[in-house]
Every structure is written in C-alpha cells, then in structure tokens.
C-alpha cells in the first residue's frame, strides 16, 4: 500500500488483504445502512466460524498469495538440471512408441469436425468470390458512366 505523493510504503500483514476483500464483497452484496456495525458483526461471525471449523481464511489466503508471488518451481540448481537431462536422455532411448487405438466414436467425431471445417472454408471461399464479382461489377458500372 502506498500513499499518493509519498515514498512511504507500508507493509500489510499477510491475510489482511483477504479479510478486507471478504468484507468488501459482503458489504457490496448486502448493501447495509450501517457499515461499521455490519463490519463488526461480519468479523464476529468470521471469528466464530474460525473457532468452530479451525479454518482461517486469512491464513489460507496468505498461503495462496505466497505461493503465487513466490513460485519456487523455476529455481532449480544447475547440478539437478544436468542430472535430469542425463536421465531424460537415457529414458528416451529405452522408450518404445505407443500406438493409440481410436474407437469408432472418436473417428466419427473427427470426421464430422473435418466436414464442418471444410464446409466453413468452402463458404468463406464462396463469399470471397461473390465480393470479387460485386467489386468488378461496380467498377465496370463506374467506367461505363464516365
């Protein structure tokens, strides 16, 4: 969060944004007249749910945000990459090609899809031809009038 015309940035506690998003969503959904009283009741209800179910949406949201912003999946070490490449090369040599057997339904669906694509393309070509004919006729008429 930042303040306009300021270089100050405040650190918001993890999960606080999720709590505010939930409150905002409920305020917009319910449209209460007294927003502070509604917010107090909302947070009390949220606390009761958290105590009963042992599930904290703020903590869960913080974990989701952390996973989103700090994705460690792409941070592999070089030695691991080299070992993985060697393993993949040895595996590809040993693998045998697998043939998939399509059922009749799959073949029928593929044929129907191909027919639809071909029909659409033929229609496109026909429309292009009609446009060319119309433009040629319009050009001939303008030449005859001049």
Swiss-Prot record:
Keyword field: Membrane
InterPro entries: cAMP_dep_PK_reg_su_I/II_a/b, DD_CABYR_SP17, IQ_motif_EF-hand-BS, Sp17
Known role: Sperm surface zona pellucida binding protein. Helps to bind spermatozoa to the zona pellucida with high affinity. Might function in binding zona pellucida and carbohydrates.
Subcellular location: Membrane
Membrane topology, record value: Peripheral membrane protein
Bias type Acidic residues, positions: 92-108
Keyword Membrane included in the entry's annotation: yes
Basic and acidic residues bias: start-end ranges: 76-88
Subunit structure: Homodimer. May interact with ROPN1.
Tissue specificity comment: Testis- and sperm-specific.
Entry-linked SMART domains: IQ, RIIa
PROSITE patterns the record matches: IQ
Entry annotated with the keyword S-adenosyl-L-methionine: no
GO biological process: binding of sperm to zona pellucida
Residue ranges annotated for the IQ domain, each copy included: 110-139
Protein name: Sperm surface protein Sp17
Free-text description of this protein's post-translational modifications in UniProt: The N-terminus is blocked.
Chain positions covered by the region annotation Disordered: 76-109
GO molecular function, a single term: calmodulin binding
Pfam families xref list: IQ (PF00612), RIIa (PF02197)
GO cellular component, one term: sperm fibrous sheath
Predominant location: membrane
